[in-house]
Amino acid sequence: MKLNELKYTPGSKKEATRVGRGMASGKGKTATRGHKGQNSRSGGGVRPGFEGGQTPLFRRLPKVGFTSLNQKQYTILNLSDLETLGLEVINHESLIDHKIIKNSSVLVKILANGTLTKKVDVKVNKISKAAKSAIEKLGGKVEVI
Protein backbone atom coordinates (compact mmCIF):
# COMPACT_ATOMS: atom_id res chain seq x y z
CA MET A 1 0.00 0.00 0.00
CA LYS A 2 1.25 3.47 -0.92
CA LEU A 3 0.24 6.90 0.36
CA ASN A 4 -1.59 7.68 -2.88
CA GLU A 5 -3.63 4.48 -2.52
CA LEU A 6 -5.03 5.33 0.93
CA LYS A 7 -8.82 5.62 1.01
CA TYR A 8 -11.23 6.69 3.72
CA THR A 9 -13.39 3.97 5.25
CA PRO A 10 -16.74 3.96 3.41
CA GLY A 11 -19.28 5.94 5.42
CA SER A 12 -16.72 7.74 7.58
CA LYS A 13 -16.84 10.94 5.49
CA LYS A 14 -20.37 12.31 5.14
CA GLU A 15 -20.86 15.00 2.53
CA ALA A 16 -22.43 18.25 3.73
CA THR A 17 -26.03 18.83 2.62
CA ARG A 18 -26.14 21.67 0.07
CA VAL A 19 -29.32 23.67 0.55
CA GLY A 20 -30.99 26.16 -1.78
CA ARG A 21 -29.80 24.47 -4.97
CA GLY A 22 -33.08 23.84 -6.77
CA MET A 23 -36.32 22.02 -6.06
CA ALA A 24 -35.07 18.70 -7.44
CA SER A 25 -32.47 18.46 -4.68
CA GLY A 26 -35.21 18.19 -2.06
CA LYS A 27 -33.63 21.06 -0.11
CA GLY A 28 -34.53 23.94 -2.43
CA LYS A 29 -37.07 26.79 -2.10
CA THR A 30 -37.07 27.54 1.66
CA ALA A 31 -33.72 25.77 2.12
CA THR A 32 -34.66 24.29 5.54
CA ARG A 33 -35.53 27.75 6.94
CA GLY A 34 -39.30 27.31 7.00
CA HIS A 35 -41.83 29.96 5.89
CA LYS A 36 -41.44 33.66 6.78
CA GLY A 37 -40.35 34.88 10.19
CA GLN A 38 -37.18 36.43 11.57
CA ASN A 39 -35.02 33.33 11.16
CA SER A 40 -35.93 32.86 7.50
CA ARG A 41 -34.61 36.31 6.57
CA SER A 42 -31.11 37.20 5.50
CA GLY A 43 -29.20 38.28 8.62
CA GLY A 44 -32.09 36.99 10.72
CA GLY A 45 -31.91 35.49 14.17
CA VAL A 46 -31.58 36.93 17.64
CA ARG A 47 -28.45 38.34 19.24
CA PRO A 48 -26.35 36.17 21.58
CA GLY A 49 -27.83 36.14 25.09
CA PHE A 50 -31.35 37.09 23.96
CA GLU A 51 -33.98 35.07 25.82
CA GLY A 52 -37.15 36.09 24.00
CA GLY A 53 -37.83 39.23 26.03
CA GLN A 54 -37.27 37.61 29.43
CA THR A 55 -34.64 39.46 31.47
CA PRO A 56 -31.43 37.77 30.32
CA LEU A 57 -29.11 35.96 32.69
CA PHE A 58 -26.34 38.58 32.46
CA ARG A 59 -28.80 41.22 33.75
CA ARG A 60 -30.32 38.98 36.43
CA LEU A 61 -26.95 38.35 38.05
CA PRO A 62 -25.29 41.09 40.14
CA LYS A 63 -22.21 42.99 39.04
CA VAL A 64 -19.15 41.57 40.76
CA GLY A 65 -15.59 42.84 41.07
CA PHE A 66 -13.46 44.87 38.71
CA THR A 67 -10.05 44.84 37.03
CA SER A 68 -7.53 46.98 38.86
CA LEU A 69 -5.60 49.31 36.56
CA ASN A 70 -2.71 49.36 39.05
CA GLN A 71 -2.24 45.60 39.24
CA LYS A 72 1.25 44.39 38.38
CA GLN A 73 1.74 41.11 36.55
CA TYR A 74 4.72 39.11 37.78
CA THR A 75 6.45 36.26 35.99
CA ILE A 76 6.62 33.52 38.64
CA LEU A 77 9.80 31.49 39.05
CA ASN A 78 10.06 28.68 41.61
CA LEU A 79 13.19 27.36 43.30
CA SER A 80 12.81 24.22 41.17
CA ASP A 81 12.99 26.44 38.05
CA LEU A 82 16.23 28.01 39.32
CA GLU A 83 17.59 24.50 39.90
CA THR A 84 16.83 23.41 36.32
CA LEU A 85 18.34 26.61 34.89
CA GLY A 86 21.60 25.79 36.67
CA LEU A 87 22.82 29.41 36.71
CA GLU A 88 24.96 31.00 39.43
CA VAL A 89 23.47 34.47 38.92
CA ILE A 90 19.77 35.05 38.30
CA ASN A 91 18.90 38.53 37.03
CA HIS A 92 16.91 40.05 34.19
CA GLU A 93 19.79 39.72 31.72
CA SER A 94 20.33 36.00 32.39
CA LEU A 95 16.57 35.33 32.22
CA ILE A 96 16.33 37.16 28.88
CA ASP A 97 19.30 35.13 27.55
CA HIS A 98 17.50 31.89 28.50
CA LYS A 99 14.19 33.17 26.99
CA ILE A 100 12.29 32.99 30.30
CA ILE A 101 11.27 36.65 29.99
CA LYS A 102 11.07 38.82 26.87
CA ASN A 103 12.59 42.09 28.09
CA SER A 104 13.85 43.88 31.20
CA SER A 105 10.51 45.63 31.85
CA VAL A 106 8.94 42.27 32.86
CA LEU A 107 8.56 41.89 36.64
CA VAL A 108 9.91 38.68 38.20
CA LYS A 109 8.92 37.05 41.50
CA ILE A 110 10.54 33.99 43.05
CA LEU A 111 8.50 31.51 45.11
CA ALA A 112 9.68 28.60 47.26
CA ASN A 113 8.16 25.63 45.39
CA GLY A 114 10.72 22.88 44.92
CA THR A 115 14.21 22.60 46.34
CA LEU A 116 17.52 24.25 45.61
CA THR A 117 20.83 22.40 46.03
CA LYS A 118 23.46 24.93 44.96
CA LYS A 119 24.35 28.53 45.75
CA VAL A 120 22.56 31.14 43.61
CA ASP A 121 22.81 34.95 43.61
CA VAL A 122 19.42 36.49 42.83
CA LYS A 123 18.45 40.00 41.73
CA VAL A 124 14.67 40.20 41.11
CA ASN A 125 11.64 42.44 41.73
CA LYS A 126 10.00 40.32 44.45
CA ILE A 127 10.75 37.19 46.46
CA SER A 128 8.84 35.25 49.10
CA LYS A 129 10.23 34.91 52.64
CA ALA A 130 10.59 31.13 52.31
CA ALA A 131 12.45 31.42 48.99
CA LYS A 132 14.74 34.12 50.39
CA SER A 133 15.67 32.03 53.43
CA ALA A 134 16.25 28.92 51.25
CA ILE A 135 18.65 30.83 48.97
CA GLU A 136 20.49 32.52 51.86
CA LYS A 137 20.79 29.19 53.73
CA LEU A 138 22.88 27.86 50.82
CA GLY A 139 25.11 30.97 50.88
CA GLY A 140 23.46 32.86 48.04
CA LYS A 141 22.74 36.60 47.94
CA VAL A 142 19.26 38.07 47.43
CA GLU A 143 18.73 41.59 46.11
CA VAL A 144 15.27 43.06 45.53
CA ILE A 145 15.22 45.75 42.83
UniProtKB/Swiss-Prot annotation:
Cited InterPro entries: Ribosomal_uL15 (IPR030878), Ribosomal_uL15/eL18 (IPR021131), Ribosomal_uL15/eL18_sf (IPR036227), Ribosomal_uL15_bac-type (IPR005749), Ribosomal_uL15_CS (IPR001196)
Keywords: Ribonucleoprotein, Ribosomal protein, RNA-binding, rRNA-binding
Biased composition (Gly residues): 42-52
Keyword Glycoprotein: no
Pfam family name, one: Ribosomal_L27A
Disordered: annotated segments: 1-54
Single GO MF descriptor: structural constituent of ribosome
Domain of life: Bacteria
GO-annotated cellular components: cytosolic large ribosomal subunit
GO biological process per UniProt: translation
RNA-binding keyword on record: yes
Function: Binds to the 23S rRNA.
HAMAP family hit by this protein: Ribosomal_uL15
Family that this chain belongs to: Belongs to the universal ribosomal protein uL15 family.
NCBIfam families the record matches: rplO_bact
Subunit relationships: Part of the 50S ribosomal subunit.
Protein name according to UniProt: Large ribosomal subunit protein uL15
Species: Mycoplasma capricolum subsp. capricolum (strain California kid / ATCC 27343 / NCTC 10154)
